[in-house]
C-alpha cells in the first residue's frame, strides 16, 4: 500500500497532545462510555480526516462528537449529525451509501474530503479559541496537501471563521467585512483560491428545530458540485452576491 503525504499527516495527528483539556475529556468519555455503547471500544484519540484526497470538494466541520467520532474514530460517524450529513452526501453523489456507522462499514467518499477545525471531542461541543489554533497547523498542511480542491464547504460559523483566519494569516485576504456567514452563501475569496460555501452545521439542535433540513443541506452540496465542475462564473446567484461584494 502506498501512503500519500496526507496519510502520513493523519498518522501524526493521531499522536497529538497539544490540548490537555481535550485529551483528558476524550479519554474520560472513552472510559465511562454511554450506556447504549457499553460494548464499544471507544476510539478516544484525535480523529483523522477522511475521504478522497483528490476530491474537488472539502468539508470543514467543527470537532468530533463525544459519542460519535470519538467513539468510532471517523469524521461525522456514529451520531445524528453524521446521519444527516451522509444521507445528504449519498443523495448528492458524494458518498457510496447513506449511513456511516463505523470505520469498517464500507463507506467510500467520492470527490470529497472531510476534515475539522478541532480533532478531539471538546466538552459541550465547544473547543476554546486556543484549542482551535492548536489544530490550525494541521488544517493548513491539509490544505496544502489536497491538490484538487475547488470548493470549501464550511459547516457552521466556527469552521467558516477558522478557514478565513487561515486565509487572512496567509495574506490571501485582507478585510473580512464583506464575508458574512449565512446558510448556502458562496464567496470568491481571491483569484486562484477555492470558492467558499457557508452552511449551517447539521447538529442535532439545528436539525431537530428545523433550522436546517436535509433539503437545505442538499442544496449546499448540489451547489458545491456545480461550482466545482463549472466554476463560479456559471453560478448566477454567486455572480449576484459577488457583484455586491465588489467582485467580478
Q: Residue ranges of each PLM-predicted region?
A:
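A polyanion-binding, active-site-adjacent surface
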Residues: 3-229
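Short, low-complexity, charge-dense intrinsically disordered segments
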Residues: 233-240, 244-248
